[in-house]
Amino acid sequence: MAALRISVWILVQALMMALVSSNSSHFLQLPQSQSVVENESVDFECQASTDPSSELHYEWLHNGHRIAYDKRVYQIGSHLHIEAVQRAEDVGDYVCIATSLASGAREASPPAKLSVIYIDSASVQLLGSNRNELLLKCHVEAVSGSDDPLQIEWYRNSAKLSSWQNVQLDQHRLIIRQPSAADDGLYRCTASNAAGRVMSKQGYVYRSSLKCLPRLPRRKNQKLPESWSKEVFLCRGKRGGSGGVEALPSAPEDLRIVQGPASHAIIKEGDPAALTCLYELPAELQNQRIQLRWRKDGKLLRHVELGNSLPLPGISSDSGKDALLREDARLVLHKQNGTLSFASIIASDAGQYQCQLQLEGYAPINSSPGTLEVIEQLKFVPQPTSKNLELDAPIAKVHCKAQGTPTPQVQWMRDDANTSLPDQVEVDANGTLIFRNVNADHRGNYTCLATNSQGQINATVAINVVVTPKFSVPPVGPIETAEQGNVVIHCQAIGDPKPTIQWDKDLTYLSENNTDRERFRFLENGTLEIRNVQAEDEGSYGCTIGNSAGLKREDVQLVVKTAGDGFPPEESGGDGFLVTRAVLITMTVALAYIVLVVGLMLWCRYRRQARKARLNELSTKEAGGDQPDGAANGKGSEQEPCLSKQRNGHGGQSRSKSNGDAQKSDDTACSQQSRASKKSAHIYEQLALPRSGLTELIQIGRGEFGDVFVGKLKASLVATGSPSDKDADTEKQHSNSENGSGGSGSGSTTLSTLNEKRRSKTSMDDIEEIKEEEQEQQQSDLDQLVLVKALNKVKDEQACQEFRRQLDLLRGISHKGVVRLFGLCREKDPHYMVLEYTDWGDLKQFLLATAGKVNTASAAATSSPPPLTTSQVLAVAYQIARGMDAIYRARFTHRDLATRNCVISSEFIVKVSYPALCKDKYSREYHKHRNTLLPIRWLAPECIQEDEYTTKSDIFAYGVVVWELFNQATKLPHEELTNEQVIQKSQAGTLEWTVAESTPDSLREILLSCWVSNPKERPSFSQLGAALSKAMQSLEK
C-alpha cells in the first residue's frame, strides 16, 4: 500500500511539472519571487486566462504541499496573502494551481521563491593580530535582500571609523596596518538591513604593546657560562619608536596635490557633479610610474596612469579587495586635471571622497577628504496599494514607506483632510497603518501623506472589509433516492460580500441554460432541487461558494436506485432486519451508558455532600460550637476548587488543633481524605493575611498560574521570629535525627539545650546574630517588601497543584538562604501567596547590571556597577548551596532553580525564591514540552524523559546556576542550540557541559560531576558547600 502511494505521488508531481512546462503561458499574471522583512505581510498574485463561459478554481502549494489556510495565511480571490511572515515556516517555493471547473484541466505556475529578510545578532571576531596588521571581522546572523545589502559600520570608542591612512574597511572586515598606541581602544561593529540594526554584544579591546627583540652581545665561538642560565635580562624599547618597521620614504616635494575636493558638497539627486583634484607633475617625473586614484569611503573607486610610463602592475595593495572598482558610465575620471565627474547623482553616491597620487616606491600623497551629501528626491518605496481586510482579524497592516532628504514624515488620513482615523486604527513610528479588531467601520479610502522640506506627496488606497465565505448549511451525503423520485441538496453560505453559489455535476457547471428547467430548480438560498430523478442524474454534485475574500467547495454523492438494481425480496427483507437490529442494539447500549453515567454522578454528589457535612461538624467542634454561615449552607468549599474558603476573617489563627480520632468514617479512604482536608484547611487559616495589608502592588510579570506583583506588607502583619534562629534549630535538629537521637524525651532535652545556648551567646557568630536581631527590631516599624503571586487559574487542576506545592515548600522551610512565606490572602479571588522580596530584586538582573547589560545609569551616575569578583561569585554560590541544602533537609525539591529565581539584597544576602516569570519576562528560558512550560536548559535528563524530580535533579540545575554566575548571566546555556535540539541531545545523552572559563580549578571537577547522567554519581549540596568554602578560603590566602 505504501509503495502504491509513493507511485501515485511521483505521478502527480510529474504531471504538475508537465503542466508547469506546457501551460505556464496560459497565465496572465504569474507569482513572482519576493524578499520580505520578517513579520511583514506579502502577497503572491496569480491570474490565469480562461474562457468567459467557464470559471477557474485556484489553490496554492508551499514546497510541494497544499497550504492549510488560517487567519495568518489565506487566499484572497486567486491571490495568496501571508500576514506576519515567519522565516521558520514561510520560506520556500510557492506554486499557483488553476483548475477549470468545467473541464477539470489543471494548470500550475512556475515556483515563486519567498526569502525572509532578518537580522539577529552581531559579534566581533579576531582573525589575526601582529605588529604589522590587526584583522577583525564582524560576524552577523542575518539575511538581506538583493536590493538592500547588509551595511557594516565600525566604531572605536564610540567614534565611527572610515578608510583613512592605516585603517581599511573591507566589507565585513576591519584592517589596521602598522597598529600603534593611537589605535588602542574598544572596537565594535553595527550591522543594518531592511529588518533593522544591531550592534555587537561584545567588542574587541586592542592594546598596543612595546615589541623589541632582546639580543645579547655574543662573539664568534663564544659560549655563555652556566651561571647565566638564571639571569634576568631587561628589554627596553625607545619611547615613540616604530617597533622596527621601516616606512616608505616621502615623495618628492614638487609632486603634490594643489587642490582637492570640497570639504562638504550638497547635490540634488539627478544633477551632475564634479570633484576637483588639481595636481603638479614635474617634468623629471614624466617617465616615472605615477598613478592618480580616487577613493570613496576608503575604497578605490577610479584610477588612471599619469605621464608616459607603463601602467603600474595591478592596483598595488588594493587589487582584488575594493568592490567599488566597477564599470559605471556615469563616472568619468579626467586625466588632464584629475577631476572626477558624475553625469547624474544617485543616492548611493553619497560618501567621503579623497584624491591620491601614488609614485612607485614612495608613500602616497593624499588630499584632504571631501564629503558628498545627496539630497534624495521624495518618493514612496514602494507605492501603497489597496487591500482587503478580514473581518474580526486581530491585527492588519497597510504599509507606507517614503524616502527623501531630509527624512520625510508620514501621516494617514481617511477620505479627506477633515476626517480623523476611526477607533482602533493607529499609525506606528514607521508610517504603517495598523487596524486592530477589524470591523465594518474601517471601510473607506485612506490617504498616505509624506512631507519634508521638498514638498508633499500622497497616495490613496481603498480598504475593504470582507468576510471569508463559510457554509451555514453544507451539502451532506451521500444521498440515495429512487428513480423518478424527488431529491433536495442543501447548500447555504454566509459572508461579506454575500457569496455566490455555483453548482456543478462531475466538475461540469450547472445552470438554468444547460439543465432541464422543469426538473432542476436553483432556489434563492442556494439549495438545488431535482424532480423526477433519472438514472443519468447520478454522480458527484459540488457546491462552490465564493466572494472577493476567497472560494470554498463541498462535494456530495447522489446515488439513484433503479428497479433492475434491487435485490430479491427475501434478501432485501433480511438486510432490512439486520439494519434494524443493529440500530436497536446501538440505541440500547447508548441508553444504558447514559443511565450509568447519571447514576455515578448522583452517587458522587451524595458522597461529596456527606463528606462536607462531616467536615462542617468537625470545624464546628474546633471553633467551640460557633458554625459560620458558609459552613451551614455548604457552599464555601465549592467556590474555590484549590483552597478552602477562609472563615470569619482571622478566626482561624486562634483555633486549636482538633482531636484526630473524632468522627470516624466507615469508608477508610473517605476518612483519610477528610482528615487531610481538615489539616490543610487548618494550615491555610494559620497563614491567613488580610488583603488590605498589601499596598503599592506593581505587576512585574506572569507565572505559571497567574500574575506576579511586587508590593509592600504592613510591618504589623509580618510574623515575628528570625529565620536565622529557626535555621539553626532546623540544622541542629536534623543533625540529632541523623545521629539516631530521635524520641520525645531527647527532643525536649535538645530544645531546652538550644534555649540555654541562645541565652548565653558569647561566640562571634552569636554576637552577629544578636546584631541582626537588634537591626530587625529597629526595622520592625518599616513596611516589608514582598513578592505576591496570584492564583488566577482556579479551574486548572495542574496550576492549583503547583500552587499548593510551592506553598508547602516555602511554608515548611525557615532558613536565611530561602525566602519566607508571610501568608495567604484568601478573602476573595484571586488568592495571593505573599513571599519575602529584596530591595535589589532577582539575581539575574543584578548579574546583568554588573556586566553592563542593563542600563543602570542615572543623572548622578554615568557608569555601570563593576563586575563581580571571583570571591563575590563564590560567596553567592555558597549562599545558594546553603539554601538548597535546607530545602533538601526539609524533604522538598525546588524543580526550577536558576538565577532568575533567586533574589539578592543590598547587604549582598542571596536567597532562593520562586518568582517563575515564565510567561513574559523570561519566556525565552522556558519551552513547552508535553503541554507544560519547562526550563529545559536547566533540567536533568531524567526530568525531561521521565518527569522525575529529585534532589539530584536540583543539583544538576545548581551546576547550571554556577555556570550562570561565572558568565554574569549574559548568555543562555547552550544558546547555540534550539530548544528541540537541547531536548534531543539531553534524551540521547549527548549534551556536553563545560564549566565557565573563570571557574577556579579546585571547583571544576565537582561542578562537572553535577551534570553526569547517573543521578547517584552527583554530589550533595553539603559537599558542594564544603568545596565552595575551601575555594573561598584559598582565595583569601
Swiss-Prot record:
Residues 724-735 have a biased composition (Basic and acidic residues). Residues 23-582 are extracellular. The modification Phosphoserine is found at residue 680. Disulfide bonds join 46-96, 138-189, 277-355, 400-448, 491-543. GO terms for cellular component: axon; plasma membrane; receptor complex. PROSITE patterns: IG_LIKE, PROTEIN_KINASE_DOM, PROTEIN_KINASE_TYR. Acts as a calcium-dependent, homophilic cell adhesion molecule that regulates neural recognition during the development of the nervous system. Component of the repulsive Plexin signaling response to regulate motor axon guidance at the embryonic stage. Also component of a receptor complex that is required in the adult visual system to innervate the lamina layer; specific targeting of R1-R6 axons. This is Tyrosine-protein kinase-like otk. It comes from Drosophila ananassae (Fruit fly). The gene is otk.
